[in-house]
Amino acid sequence: MRSLKLAEGCKGTQVYALNPSAPTPPPPPGNSSTGGGGGGGSGGGTGGVGDKLLQHLSDHLRVNSVRSKSSRTYPPPTQPNAVVSPEFLLPCGLPVTDLLEPQIDPCLKFVDLVEKMAQVYRRIENCSQFEKSGAYLEQCAIFRGISDPKLFRRSLRSSRQHAVDVHAKVVLASWLRFERREDELIGTTSMDCCGRNLECPKATLVSGYDPESVYDPCVCSGASRSEMMNEDECSTSQEVDYDMSFCIGDEEVRCVRYKIASLSRPFKAMLYGGFREMKRATINFTQNGISVEGMRAAEIFSRTNRLDNFPPNVVLELLKLANRFCCDELKSACDSHLAHLVNSLDEAMLLIEYGLEEAAYLLVAACLQVFLRELPSSMHNPNVIKIFCSAEGRERLASLGHASFTLYFFLSQIAMEDDMKSNTTVMLLERLVECAVDSWEKQLAYHQLGVVMLERKEYKDAQRWFNAAVEAGHLYSLVGVARTKFKRDHRYSAYKIINSLISDHKATGWMHQERSLYCSGKEKLLDLDTATEFDPTLTFPYKFRAVALVEENQFGAAIAELNKILGFKASPDCLEMRAWISIGMEDYEGALKDIRALLTLEPNFMMFNWKIHGDHMVELLRPLAQQWSQADCWMQLYDRWSSVDDIGSLAVVHHMLANDPGKSLLRFRQSLLLLRLNCQKAAMRSLRLARNHSKSEHERLVYEGWILYDTGHREEALAKAEESISIQRSFEAFFLKAYALADSTLDPDSSNYVIQLLQEALKCPSDGLRKGQALNNLGSVYVDCEKLDLAADCYTNALTIKHTRAHQGLARVYHLKNQRKAAYDEMTKLIEKAQNNASAYEKRSEYCDREMAQSDLCLATQLDPLRTYPYRYRAAVLMDDHKESEAIDELSRAISFKPDLQLLHLRAAFYDSMGEGASAIKDCEAALCIDPGHADTLELYHKAREPNDQK
């Protein structure tokens, strides 16, 4: 670990496994067990418990076949030591291959992702400043497809930064807020401001293009309207020379003729244009739909241009008057004034009708802003649904410039997350289609509507929308066309579609995965193996192979197959499958561990073909597993910590939270583990729960700081840490401050300050899990400062409290002291202790000769194909051996499923050295799409473009 900002220096706890090597799975159960309960000599007593479990499960399936929330509790089985046959826990039986099929990704997916990323980069660079927001939105759609939340949020921020009109600012700022799910934070309101113009609900209502100011502090906490008044109310002042009156009913409103005339051309024509009213001192205004209070307000505005002291109902009257008599300045003032009054859902529901009727652009924008900042709860309000979902509602919004692709892109994503099959989702996607103009917009809208229709089993409509997406240029939608044909018993037709796709284009993992559905036997397995070779992150091939092994009664091999992907990707569906098979093997401890882990990732997960809630399976399995007290759980957590078993650690924390759900410290640890597993969405949910359950203000501030830091708000996170320290000195506050400060290139003074902060953290009370991490990070800073002996002391102290990752830091110290053998041995110790040890093999490769390094890196890739260093090393070795094409192939293999910045940069450099300028430029552009400020890539890009620029 070179610095705190590297992956190995993650702030998260490294929580480790009880047994570094998993035990050999027991053989599959035989068929000799009786129907009463277990396969043993327990007799009738066991059968009675089995009957209770069966009845319990059957009742659950009958009454609660579909459940959407996890908040219910279930009565556990009464006997804790029962021996129960798997049949009672699996009334649906074991999984079968015939029921397995991969989901179609609802996001944009490309045959040549690198080319698409390069195109988007060129579009962003070459378009006008007023088109940049839309270009960044397309980039958002691409990054959504590669499941990188940080890249997605960065593009979304850029889209908001370059937004010009109020509507786009409102939608994009609300979307940014939703991505942090601040609606889940107790004690906050939808209109709370984060302190920057980027998301400030008042700043979004200011039109104009000013990208440089979006990160400035906002002025929403400045002076109120009343404080801005610099003159007294003067509507009845004797200094005013009234020269006419408007008569409304029995009352008169005295006015200044030329002031009223200045409100609009119609008023000027009426009062000075030869009409009979020109000669009258009193004009009857009774039939013009305005009250005496309204007319008095109009008179005051005509002299002061202010609306500050008028109640909303009077301002609404003025808005109507302004529309009737074309008073543009008055209308603009009323629109702005009313817009700044909208702060709640009830106010927004009331005022949006006035806004739409009176064509008040800002007022409607303000109401929309409340609806959007109240998401997802506002999506369940029938009045909000009517405005957003109906064709009439969209037309009304469009008449004011408030129906956009951006709006419906945002809304449809939320609806699909909430319920893919709902009518609301369908209607929002239909509105999205109506708003789609650009090619990529049509591709996305058509494809997503096809996916939803497929989920609803409306196959003809699904096929129609998938075909439309293909015609718009989205080749991945051919997967949807083939699937809908397959569902309608046109299997051969489906096969031909995907076979042609593979023949006509460079094959990808998802192509072979899809074709496997439409063939059988060895051909199916060959396609699945090819899919894994092209893209090892696809979960379906592992699941299918595992279930095929189960069908052959090879349970241990099935578990081993799933372990391959779960070693580097915490996939809920693979955890479910492993738990399912474990129950069949009567490994209830293993099943319970996996179910607890997947419920941490997805709390509302429905298991076994959406039949049983995961929480219910926990209740059924819990009596069959070893019972732990909270103290036992802490010991288990330490054991898993020391053997780098993150999934096992998640299961232990889930168990502990079941006993103490309000423990914010446990929620925080859970979030850190999830970040280590690259499950950011679940991690942020745990962080929010930690913040909500915090018992003190200083603790709450720390969790708020981590939320801000993890969503890209480093300065705000530092401020939270400092505020927490000012209230009470604590380990976590000092650690947060040190971590946030270290997330940059440190000069000597900054490094010394980070060292002081970590030393202060270590003086504060905490447990060994966190102190080990602090010692590890402190050692990293000492290494960067070339204080190797102090670093070695830190790593040694960390190892004494079972912070196993410290072996890696100590190995680096040995390496810097030219003790290469000691460094190698230190990494070997980590490999022996760690259950997840791909990174350890990768790091050990730095401390041995080329042949041994190659061996270690091959193992690292086998264990975790997402690690990019092994590909880069092997490619560099091939280039040194003048095997250019093999080096390019090595990098391309990884880029095809992980378009990584470093991989793209290295391949671009190789292309440049080979004289293939066009390929080098394309890879540079794709890399700059990921990080537009990457200095080395920018330098290479300009160099590769020089021949073209000279031409």
UniProtKB/Swiss-Prot annotation:
Residues 242-342 form the BTB domain. It comes from the Eukaryota. Predominantly expressed in flowers. Pathway: Protein modification; protein ubiquitination. Disruption phenotype: Compact rosette with smaller leaves, reduced petiole lengths and shorter inflorescences. Residues 15-52 are annotated as: Disordered. Keywords: Coiled coil, Ethylene signaling pathway, Repeat, TPR repeat, Ubl conjugation pathway. It holds the Pfam family TPR_8. TPR repeats lie at residues 443-476, 539-572, 573-605, 698-731, 772-805, 807-837, 868-901, 903-934. Residues 815-854 form a coiled coil. CDD domains: BTB_POZ_ETO1-like. GO terms for biological process: ethylene-activated signaling pathway; negative regulation of ethylene-activated signaling pathway; protein ubiquitination. Residues 33-50 have a biased composition (Gly residues). Belongs to the ETO1 family. The BTB/POZ-like domain may mediate the interaction with some component of ubiquitin ligase complexes. Interacts with the C-terminal domain of ACS4, ACS5 and ACS9. Interacts with CUL3A. Putative component of a ubiquitin ligase complex containing CUL3. Essential regulator of the ethylene pathway, which acts by regulating the stability of 1-aminocyclopropane-1-carboxylate synthase (ACS) enzymes. May act as a substrate-specific adapter that connects ACS enzymes, such as ACS5, to ubiquitin ligase complexes, leading to proteasomal degradation of ACS enzymes. This is Ethylene-overproduction protein 1. It comes from Arabidopsis thaliana.
